[in-house]
C-alpha cells in the first residue's frame, strides 16, 4: 500500500491496484497533482456545500473523497463504481478520512438491463463499453474480464438511499452520452454537473456537441479539456 495526501485528503492505494499501469502511473499522477485534475477543478468550481451528490465512476475514491470534503455533510454523497476489485479501496479511503458517504457497486445507465461490464487491472478503464484496444495485453494491463452485471439508474439510487441528488460528478468511460441524452428531463433540474467525455470510446449515436446543445437552455457550460462543467442558469 502507498499513501498520499491529495487535495487536502488522505489517499491510500492497495498494492493490487498498483500492479498494472498505463501511461503515467497513478501514484505519479497523485505526486504531481494531475490525478483527475480536470474533474476535481470542475467540482471545486461548481459544487455548493449544500449539494447532494451522485458520483459515478468512483474508481479508487479520490474524487469521491474530495467531494466529501467540500460538502457540509459527507453522507450527502453516493459514490458508484462498477469494478468489483476497487470497492474495498474506496471504502478504505472513505474510512481513513472519517467520511460517511455510501458506496454502490454497480454499473449505471439510463435503464435497467443486464450488461457485460469490462475491466482489467487498470483502475481507470472499466466500462460497459468494450475497449478492444485494451484486450490482449494481460502482462501489461491485467486480464481483460467481462462480467454480467445489472445496471442501476440514478432514480434507483435516489430510492435506495433516500436522497434527492442536486449535483453530478460523472466519469463512466463512454456511457455518459446515453445517460445524459435519455435522462435529460432528470438531469436538467440539477444545480450543476461535471462530466468527463470519452470521445474515443463513444459507441453512442450522440456526441459531446449534441449533449451540450441539448442542455444549453438550462446550463452555462464550460470545458476543461475532456471535462465539461454544467452550471444552472
Predicted feature locations:
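S-adenosyl-L-methionine
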Residues: 1-102, 141-142, 161, 199-233
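Glycine-rich adenosyl-binding loop in Rossmann-like folds that engage adenosine-containing cofactors
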Residues: 9, 13-39, 109-152, 156
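Active-site segment flanking the S-adenosylmethionine/decSAM binding pocket
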Residues: 52-60, 64, 146-203
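Short phosphate-engaging motifs
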Residues: 86, 124, 175-179
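Short, hinge-like loop/turn segments at secondary-structure boundaries
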Residues: 95-97, 118-123, 186-187, 211-213
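Beta-strand->loop->alpha-helix junctions that form or flank phosphate-binding loops
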Residues: 103-110, 171
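A short acidic, often aromatic-flanked loop/helix-cap motif at beta-alpha or helix-coil junctions
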Residues: 108-112, 227-230
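Short, well-ordered secondary-structure micro-motifs
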Residues: 114-116, 180, 205-206
Amino acid at each position: 500500500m502507498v499513501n498520499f495526501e491529495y487535495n487536502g485528503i488522505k489517499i491510500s492505494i492497495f498494492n493490487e491496484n498498483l500492479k498494472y499501469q498505463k501511461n503515467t502511473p497513478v501514484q505519479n499522477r497523485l505526486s504531481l497533482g494531475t490525478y483527475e485534475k480536470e474533474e476535481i477543478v470542475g467540482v471545486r468550481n461548481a459544487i455548493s456545500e449544500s449539494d447532494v451528490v451522485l458520483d459515478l465512476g468512483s474508481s479508487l475514491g479520490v474524487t469521491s473523497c474530495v467531494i466529501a470534503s467540500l460538502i457540509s455533510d459527507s453522507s450527502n454523497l453516493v459514490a458508484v463504481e462498477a469494478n468489483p476489485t476497487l470497492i474495498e479501496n474506496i471504502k478504505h479511503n472513505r474510512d481513513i478520512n472519517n467520511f460517511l458517504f455510501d458506496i454502490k457497486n454497480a454499473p449505471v445507465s439510463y435503464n435497467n438491463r443486464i450488461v457485460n461490464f469490462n475491466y482489467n487491472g487498470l483502475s481507470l478503464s472499466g466500462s460497459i463499453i468494450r475497449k478492444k484496444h485494451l484486450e490482449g495485453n494481460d502482462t501489461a494491463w491485467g486480464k481483460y474480464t467481462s462480467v454480467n452485471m445489472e445496471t442501476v439508474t440514478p432514480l434507483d439510487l435516489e430510492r435506495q438511499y433516500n436522497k434527492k441528488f442536486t449535483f453530478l460528478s460523472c466519469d463512466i468511460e463512454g456511457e455518459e452520452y446515453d445517460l445524459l441524452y435519455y435522462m435529460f428531463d432528470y438531469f436538467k433540474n440539477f444545480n450543476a454537473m461535471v462530466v468527463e467525455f470519452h470521445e474515443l470510446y463513444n459507441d453512442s449515436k450522440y456526441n459531446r456537441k449534441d449533449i451540450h446543445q441539448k442542455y444549453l437552455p438550462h446550463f452555462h457550460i464550460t470545458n476543461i479539456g475532456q471535462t465539461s462543467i454544467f452550471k444552472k442558469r
